[in-house]
């Protein structure tokens, strides 16, 4: 009889433990006004849109523990979708602007650069979509991991963070490679233009010099020699002017490339800092959950032991 009573008590306590009281999710208040980072206020429109996307994620991460489950609500998903669409729209416009600047470059080079920029744009969109889908999976993953050990929970969390960091670093490295290809293509087009100008004007200058020498040797008239020399000087001045304009254009392209490189490096550093902050925030989310699970399990064990001990105590007899 005591054994049956102990088994019934254990089953009853286990059933009570299985019915975990659900936490009432408070409603999100009005979304605060978001601003792009100060460093991106003077950047390209697509950079400002991407800054608003990351600012929104940072705001979501600063929510209190009582509203963490609201991260998966339809409102957050809709906001992220709108910011992603805005970023991709501005990025397409910036890509069209770059293609117009590459008009002096050869058709083959321009097509290659356009294809590579389009691939980088697709990878950026895929990574942003992965961030949104990963937020949507957190609730189901937490519910699935409630019955697992602490070590397995921490291992899965660390694995997710490592994958996110590697992906961000890989995207930054790929953007730097695309920038190097763009710089090489611009320099190649400018140098090709200078060479073509030299090839066209070189024979004219030589022809002018030869004609001036012929006229000077055949005619002894001083005015004719002066006119020939003046004509040669005008051709030389024209060639130098064209060469100077080409060099100025090349310097301008180099300056633009350096500005883009500096912006990408700054964004890479910001993305690394955001990844580290995101990792620390996730750890602070999951550690209280693990500690609460341990306390509940310890309380359940103590209740079962107390119940078994109470049922095992012999009842004193009235007969002496």
UniProtKB/Swiss-Prot annotation:
GO terms for cellular component: chylomicron; extracellular exosome; extracellular matrix; extracellular space; high-density lipoprotein particle; intermediate-density lipoprotein particle; low-density lipoprotein particle; multivesicular body, internal vesicle. It comes from the Eukaryota. Residues 212-293 are annotated as: Lipid-binding and lipoprotein association. The modification Methionine sulfoxide is found at residue 145. Its main location: secreted. Residues 281-293 are annotated as: Specificity for association with VLDL. Keywords: Chylomicron, Endosome, Extracellular matrix, Glycoprotein, HDL, Heparin-binding, Lipid transport, Lipid-binding, Oxidation, Phosphoprotein, Repeat, Secreted, Signal, Transport, VLDL. Disulfide bonds: none annotated. APOE exists as multiple glycosylated and sialylated glycoforms within cells and in plasma. The extent of glycosylation and sialylation are tissue and context specific. Glycated in plasma VLDL. Residues 160-170 are annotated as: LDL and other lipoprotein receptors binding. Pfam families: Apolipoprotein (PF01442). GO terms for biological process: acylglycerol homeostasis; cholesterol efflux; cholesterol metabolic process; chylomicron remnant clearance; high-density lipoprotein particle assembly; intermediate-density lipoprotein particle clearance; lipoprotein biosynthetic process; melanosome organization. Residues 1-18 form the signal peptide. It is found in: Secreted; Secreted, Extracellular space; Secreted, Extracellular space, Extracellular matrix; Extracellular vesicle. One of its GO terms (molecular function) is identical protein binding. Heparin binds at residues 164-167, 232-239. Residues 269-320 are annotated as: Homooligomerization. Residues 82-199 are annotated as: 8 X 22 AA approximate tandem repeats. Sequence repeats lie at residues 82-103, 104-125, 126-147, 148-169, 170-191, 192-213, 214-236, 237-258. Homotetramer. May interact with ABCA1; functionally associated with ABCA1 in the biogenesis of HDLs. May interact with APP/A4 amyloid-beta peptide; the interaction is extremely stable in vitro but its physiological significance is unclear. May interact with MAPT. May interact with MAP2. In the cerebrospinal fluid, interacts with secreted SORL1. Interacts with PMEL; this allows the loading of PMEL luminal fragment on ILVs to induce fibril nucleation. APOE is an apolipoprotein, a protein associating with lipid particles, that mainly functions in lipoprotein-mediated lipid transport between organs via the plasma and interstitial fluids. APOE is a core component of plasma lipoproteins and is involved in their production, conversion and clearance. Apolipoproteins are amphipathic molecules that interact both with lipids of the lipoprotein particle core and the aqueous environment of the plasma. Belongs to the apolipoprotein A1/A4/E family. This is Apolipoprotein E. The lineage of its organism: Eukaryota, Metazoa, Chordata, Craniata, Vertebrata. The gene is APOE.
């Amino acid at each position: 009889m005591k054994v049956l009573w102990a088994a019934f008590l254990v089953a009853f306590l286990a059933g009570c433990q299985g019915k975990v009281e659900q936490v009432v999710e408070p409603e999100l208040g009005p979304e605060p006004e978001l601003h792009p980072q100060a460093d991106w206020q003077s950047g390209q429109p697509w950079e400002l849109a991407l800054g608003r996307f990351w600012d929104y994620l940072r705001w979501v991460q600063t929510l209190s523990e009582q509203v963490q489950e609201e991260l998966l609500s339809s409102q957050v998903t809709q906001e992220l979708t709108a910011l992603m669409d805005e970023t991709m729209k501005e990025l397409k416009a910036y890509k069209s602007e770059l293609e117009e600047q590459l008009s002096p470059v050869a058709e083959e080079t321009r097509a290659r650069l356009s294809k590579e920029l389009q691939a980088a744009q697709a990878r950026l969109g895929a990574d942003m979509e992965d961030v949104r889908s990963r937020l949507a999976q957190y609730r189901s993953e937490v519910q699935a991991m409630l019955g697992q050990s602490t070590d397995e929970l921490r291992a899965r969390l660390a694995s997710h963070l490592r994958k996110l960091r590697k992906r961000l670093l890989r995207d930054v490295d790929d953007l730097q490679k695309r920038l190097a290809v763009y710089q090489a293509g611009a320099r190649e087009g400018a140098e090709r233009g200078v060479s073509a100008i030299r090839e066209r004007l070189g024979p004219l200058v030589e022809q002018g010099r030869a004609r001036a020498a012929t006229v000077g040797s055949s005619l002894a008239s001083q005015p004719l020699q002066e006119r020939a020399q003046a004509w040669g000087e005008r051709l030389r001045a024209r060639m130098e002017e064209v060469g100077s304009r080409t060099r100025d254009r090349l310097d301008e392209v180099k300056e633009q490339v350096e500005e883009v490189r500096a912006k990408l490096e700054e964004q890479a550093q910001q993305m690394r800092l955001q990844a580290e902050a995101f990792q620390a925030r996730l750890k602070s989310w999951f550690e209280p959950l693990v500690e609460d699970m341990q306390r509940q399990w310890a309380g359940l064990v103590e209740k079962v032991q107390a119940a078994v001990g109470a049922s095992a105590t012999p009842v004193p007899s009235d007969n002496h």
